[in-house]
Every structure is written in C-alpha cells, then in structure tokens.
C-alpha cells in the first residue's frame, strides 16, 4: 500500500503535525529515538527510583549507550578549544592570554581523565542502580510479608483468603478462630476467652477438631474434609451452624410454612396428604383477653368535652422564660413535675 494512501492517525503524526520519517520508527536507527522509550527505574538517578513518571527531567537520566556518552563528552571538550583558537587571532593580547590559559586548562583536564574509566564508571552506576532497586524491592516484599504475618491471626476471618482460613481452622494446639464471633464480652486484662456454642466433644484424631454430639447440630465429619470444597469447618465455624436445631424426623427438609399441605417421607405410602402443624399452633396455651365493654368514666373525672383555649391568653406565654422552662420540663425527666413530687 502506498504511504500517501495511509490514514493520518494522530499516533503517526509528529508534534508539529507532520508525518515522521521512517528512521524514527526503526528501533535504534533514528537520531531522536532515545526520547521515545519509557524511563525505566534502572535509568533513574539514585534515590528517585519510586518517583512518579514525568517528575524527573530527561537530563538526569543516563543514556543507555555508553559509547555515545563518550563521543558526546569528547565533542563537548573539543569544541570550546577550537572556538577559542579561531577567535584568538582577532582578540587583543590580554584576551589571547586568558583564552590560551583556559584552553590549556581544558586540555590538561582531558589528558588527566583517561577514556577507559568513563565506561567503568557508567557500568558501576548501572550496577548500583540495579542493586539499589533490588534492595528496595526486597525491603518492600519483607514489609508486606511482615504485615501479613502480623495481621493474619488478628484480622477478621472473612478478610483472609481461603487457604489461610483452612490453615487457621486446622491449626494444632490452638482453639478455632471462628469462635471469636460467639464471645460475649472483652476482658481488658487478659485475651478474650474463646468458646463454642453447642455440645462439643473432641475427636481422637486431633486435639482441636471438634465434633458435635448426635443430639447437637451436625452430622459426623466426612472424609477428605481438607479440600477447598469443605472450606468452612462445620464443627468450628458458625457460618454453617443453623439458627435452630434440626428436627429428628426425616422429613424436615420437606416442611413448608405453617399450615401448608406437605407430604412427609414417612407418609409417602398414604395416598391422601395430611395437614402437618407444629404443636405450638395446635395447642393454645394463652387465654384470650376478656372483652371490655366501653364504659363511661366516673363523673368525678369526666367534666365534659375539652374547652378551647386561645394560646395568647395562657399565662405561660406572657413571659418567654417561663414558657421555655415549661417546655424543658415537659420534655426531660429530671425537670418534670413527677420527679419533684416523688
């Protein structure tokens, strides 16, 4: 496809709006390729590894190509000397002396610094960057692991991952963590007493895995309960314990609401369904209240319908302070008349 026929998308355009040349998009061949690559943490100066992108100027970033840095340094050192020599013919004698001194100083500096240590210094800096970044990452990882270790036993159980939950449930020589939900009060001096609701007897296998009695809530433990499918231990976790004890009959799953016609497992051979009601509804232990006839009150208390009173004539509203006192007295117990009489 011809290049002129390609659509001009913004990603293919320069900052000036022109189409860039091919050499910019070839890796490492263009002249201004360096600014296209993202600044990696290895290129950042020491102490700025975690700085936000864009906050560090590209001048502070070391170039990747060590040889290019050497060539640039040589050019920078040679250019002022050449300029001074070309201009020195038109200058006065004093300026000549000063310029030659400057040139000699720069030449001495360039002769004193050999070319090979530049490469070793940049390599050492690069290694220092790598070591510093690795140390920083190691410290962060250690801090994260420490936080996990510290918070694991004290954090609420639903915030922990699944594997941690199973490990905490089956942890030897410690009471199950889930029972902290059943505790009544926190004592200030000693750690909270953990206890389980229901009748509990310890199994012979491990000291902490508890099994409820047959008259309790749950059935015997299935084999292979360490799988993630049995994540919540039904013997220690209150998440699996039902709110009420299940009935002994085999038909407790088939029961519907009160008074509905249900067919029990034990009654399946009967063709006609029976109405099943709990005992609490079949027997009424409470006696109904006696019907009180609407009697008129005694003449002592009943003086007729209430007489309307205008608000402006009432003595409470004459002084605003007295009305405020009455309002307070009517709303609070400590200022009420009943308290004064008592």
UniProtKB/Swiss-Prot annotation:
GO terms for biological process: negative regulation of transcription by RNA polymerase II; regulation of transcription by RNA polymerase II. It is found in: Cytoplasm; Nucleus. Keywords: Cytoplasm, Nucleus, Repressor, Transcription, Transcription regulation. Residues 205-218, 309-323 have a biased composition (Polar residues). Residues 271-280 have a biased composition (Basic residues). InterPro entries: TF_Nrm1/Whi5. Its main location: cytoplasm. Residues 1-22, 83-126, 183-228, 266-330 are annotated as: Disordered. One of its GO terms (cellular component) is nucleus. Residues 97-114 have a biased composition (Basic and acidic residues). Pfam families: Whi5 (PF08528). The keyword Transcription regulation applies. GO terms for molecular function: RNA polymerase II cis-regulatory region sequence-specific DNA binding; transcription corepressor activity. Negative regulatory component of the MBF complex involved in cell-cycle-dependent transcription. Belongs to the WHI5/NRM1 family. Component of the MBF transcription factor complex. This is Transcription factor nrm1.
């Amino acid at each position: 496809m011809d290049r002129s026929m390609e659509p001009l998308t913004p990603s293919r355009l320069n900052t000036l709006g022109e189409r860039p040349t091919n050499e910019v998009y070839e890796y490492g061949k263009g002249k201004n390729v360096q600014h296209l690559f993202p600044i990696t943490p290895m290129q950042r100066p020491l102490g700025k590894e975690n700085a936000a992108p864009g906050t560090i100027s590209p001048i502070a970033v070391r170039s990747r190509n060590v040889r290019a840095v050497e060539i640039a340094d040589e050019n920078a050192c040679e250019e002022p000397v050449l300029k001074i020599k070309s201009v020195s013919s038109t200058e006065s004698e004093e300026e000549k002396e000063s310029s030659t001194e400057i040139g000699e100083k720069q030449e001495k500096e360039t002769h004193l610094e050999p070319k090979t240590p530049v490469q070793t210094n940049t390599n050492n800096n690069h290694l220092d960057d790598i070591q510093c970044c690795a140390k920083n990452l190691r410290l962060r990882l250690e801090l994260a692991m420490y936080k996990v270790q510290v918070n694991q036993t004290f954090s609420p159980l639903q915030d922990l991952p699944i594997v941690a939950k199973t490990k905490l449930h089956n942890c030897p020589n410690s009471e199950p963590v889930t029972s902290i939900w059943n505790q009544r009060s926190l004592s200030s001096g000693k750690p909270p007493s953990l206890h389980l609701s229901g009748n509990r007897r310890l199994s012979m296998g491990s000291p902490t895995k508890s099994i409820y009695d047959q008259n309790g809530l749950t059935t015997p433990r299935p084999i292979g309960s360490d799988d993630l499918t049995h994540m919540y231990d039904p013997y220690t976790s209150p998440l699996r314990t039902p709110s009420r004890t299940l009935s002994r009959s085999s038909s407790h799953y088939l029961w519907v609401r009160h008074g509905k016609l249900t067919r029990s497992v034990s009654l399946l051979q009967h063709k006609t369904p029976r109405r099943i009601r709990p005992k609490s509804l079949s027997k009424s232990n409470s006696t109904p209240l006696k019907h009180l006839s609407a009697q008129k009150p005694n003449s002592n208390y009943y003086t007729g319908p209430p007489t309307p009173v205008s608000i402006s004539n009432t003595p409470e509203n004459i002084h605003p302070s007295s009305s405020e006192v009455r309002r307070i007295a009517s709303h609070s117990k400590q200022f009420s008349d009943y308290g004064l009489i008592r």
